[in-house]
């Protein structure tokens, strides 16, 4: 079941998955219960993040899972975050504390390989007060997409065995107890 409270995004998802027989849509979650809830780069958009984690818990079956990703490191917070309507970035400690009523299955930074180039770029642009490009033409760049695919696949393999010491984002898998 796909739940998306934002109207434009909801319409987009309905169009994208209109021919899928396995995808259901819910405009209101109500008291529905799920075995898995994925919140990929969602929580940082919500002013009261503790409240949304409580809501996620209420919509999980007993022993259900939340897979969540958020941007990492407050020192990287920039105008781009504001443009994306982010309220915050997280440290591992803050994110762990947010899910303190859950069992932690996995908690790690990710987007580790690109951390230094991205962090340095953000910090330089903040220092010289240049804003990020506001609009990027929406054309796929196959070379970059292929490179990112390879890098993220490599990180996925590393994450099976190790937690990463830093990264642009954090991933957590939490189990309701």
PLM region spans:
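Short secondary-structure junctions
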Residues: 103-106
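A C-terminal cap/extension of S-adenosyl-L-methionine-dependent methyltransferases
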Residues: 111-177
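Short, hinge-like loop/turn segments at secondary-structure boundaries
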Residues: 17-21, 84-87, 122-126
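Short glycine/proline- and charge-enriched loop/turn segments
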Residues: 74-81, 130-133
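Short aromatic-enriched loop/helix-cap "lid" or pocket-rim segments at secondary-structure transitions
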Residues: 13, 78-82, 117-121
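Conserved SAM-binding loop
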Residues: 1-78, 91-96, 172-176
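Acceptor-substrate binding/catalytic loop of class I
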Residues: 78-97, 108-111
